[in-house]
Design a protein with these regions (language model features):
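Metabolite-binding pocket within alpha/beta catalytic cores that recognizes anionic/polar moieties
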Residues: 1-75
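General beta-strand structural signal in soluble alpha/beta enzymes
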Residues: 3-5, 34-38, 54, 98-104, ...
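Non-catalytic positions within long, well-ordered alpha-helices that form the structural scaffold/packing
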Residues: 27-30, 121, 140
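Generic non-transmembrane alpha-helical segments
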Residues: 82, 86-96, 182-190
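Active-site/ligand-binding-proximal alpha/beta "capping" segment
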Residues: 89-126
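Zn-dependent metallopeptidase/amidohydrolase metal-coordination segment
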Residues: 130-168
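His/Asp/Glu-rich mid-to-C-terminal helical/loop segments that flank catalytic regions of hydrolases
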Residues: 157-193
Length: 193
């Protein structure tokens, strides 16, 4: 087991190579199962802040790949059914309300507009964030089993009547820490069996 804390973001000026470098290091260390976590904004009222979502599909809204027609990718090389099953089992045993959905990747660093959120929803997006997809792609390309968990820390712009603040994001992340730790610990134990 190897745990890495934090990540580099492209909006911080990091190149794609720098962003995915930690995944390459993990693979070189012999890591076969990769659990990626992030904070994301919920695109659905039924997935309130504090919810944890298994990423079952992803949509690239950065347009950096030359594709101008974003589509959901649910390829199993990016999203392991085995690891998802373990996560769902752990959540049931521990009373953790685990959601499923599609993660929308944007570059940031500004929060999205309500018009962008409407577009993401029209393509079946469930959550939006400014990281993670490069790591998912690299892990999949390297043949790692992947599980991505999004901690939904806020409603995305226009979903709630309340204005979005970074303080809300940090507060909700802190409030959900115990559930996330319990879930991750259980998943790791499930993988080790």
């Amino acid at each position: 087991i190897l745990v890495a804390s934090g990540r580099m973001h492209m909006y911080e000026g990091c190149s794609l190579d720098k962003v995915i470098f930690p995944i390459k290091v993990l693979k070189e260390c012999g890591i076969e199962n990769l659990i990626i976590t992030n904070s994301a904004g919920s695109l659905k009222m039924e997935n309130p802040p504090g919810s944890i979502m298994i990423v079952e599909g992803h949509i690239d809204f950065t347009f950096k790949d030359g594709i101008d027609n974003p589509k959901i990718r649910t390829d199993k090389k990016f999203h392991s059914l085995e690891l998802s099953s373990i996560a769902k089992s752990v959540s049931l045993k521990n009373g953790i309300d685990l959601k499923n959905g599609n993660y929308c990747w944007v570059l940031g660093p500004a929060y999205e507009t309500s018009l962008e959120i409407n577009y993401f929803q029209s393509l079946s997006g469930s959550a939006v964030g400014m990281s993670t997809l490069p790591e998912i792609r690299e892990g999949g390309a390297l043949g790692m089993k992947l599980l991505t968990l999004s901690l939904l820390t806020n409603f995305a712009a226009g979903i709630s009547k309340q204005p979005l603040t970074h303080e809300e994001v940090l507060e909700n992340a802190g409030n959900s820490k115990e559930s996330m730790i319990k879930l991750l610990s259980g998943i790791i134990q499930g993988i080790e069996k």
